[in-house]
Amino acid sequence: MVTHSKFPAAGMSRPLDTSLRLKTFSSKSEYQLVVNAVRKLQESGFYWSAVTGGEANLLLSAEPAGTFLIRDSSDQRHFFTLSVKTQSGTKNLRIQCEGGSFSLQSDPRSTQPVPRFDCVLKLVHHYMPPPGTPSFSLPPTEPSSEVPEQPPAQALPGSTPKRAYYIYSGGEKIPLVLSRPLSSNVATLQHLCRKTVNGHLDSYEKVTQLPGPIREFLDQYDAPL
């Protein structure tokens, strides 16, 4: 499958081609935010650029629940969409970009604060459960829109409370679980090593102890996924 993104691919060394883009940037800072997001997404290995919702559904159809990908949004009001395989099929969640941050589009009736991040990768990582976290499901509820909601989850004995996230869609309340990205290309050994290192750098002090070239390489992609 050959697709063409509305964003340039060559290291983001040139400005975004506004003729290929639908959503208008609200400011120079938002432009730079999206430029940085695209650069990191292109290195992530699970950015599928211009695939459509139907194509994303086909790509994820044979994958287990929890498999996900990021693609360009087909909605002119948004830049990116998170497509995820759930226990009820593939769901597409728009990623909002406003106020200098990214967030998943949520139910406007929700009173819960929406997590916001300066990077799409950080957003994705936030919704990924820690290793060993059990999965769960809920019975159907009244219909609502296909947007995430985040009521508190029950804590396991001896553990701290964690927040669970759900998608309301087609009369169901579906747990939002991001467990494995769907790779669009083969990652280099350098990138795999970088992700591993990022996952073990839990303090700023550890980063500053690394040689300058390594710190710069890690800064270019500062996520463990």
Curated annotation (Swiss-Prot):
Gene name for this UniProt entry: Socs3
SUPFAM superfamilies for the chain: SH2 domain, SOCS box-like
Pathway(s) it belongs to: Protein modification; protein ubiquitination
Organism field: Mus musculus
Residue ranges of every copy of the SH2 domain listed in the record: 46-142
Domain SOCS box stretches: 177-224
UniProt GO MF annotations: miRNA binding; phosphotyrosine residue binding; protein tyrosine kinase inhibitor activity
Role of this protein: SOCS family proteins form part of a classical negative feedback system that regulates cytokine signal transduction. SOCS3 is involved in negative regulation of cytokines that signal through the JAK/STAT pathway. Inhibits cytokine signal transduction by binding to tyrosine kinase receptors including IL6ST/gp130, LIF, erythropoietin, insulin, IL12, GCSF and leptin receptors. Binding to JAK2 inhibits its kinase activity and regulates IL6 signaling. Suppresses fetal liver erythropoiesis. Regulates onset and maintenance of allergic responses mediated by T-helper type 2 cells.
Tissue: Low expression in lung, spleen and thymus. Expressed in Th2 but not TH1 cells.
GO BP annotations, alphabetical order: branching involved in labyrinthine layer morphogenesis; cell differentiation; cellular response to interleukin-17; cellular response to leukemia inhibitory factor; intracellular signal transduction; negative regulation of inflammatory response; negative regulation of insulin receptor signaling pathway; negative regulation of receptor signaling pathway via JAK-STAT
Effect of L22A: No effect on LIF-induced signal transduction suppression
Protein name, as recorded: Suppressor of cytokine signaling 3
Keywords: Growth regulation, Phosphoprotein, SH2 domain, Signal transduction inhibitor, Ubl conjugation pathway
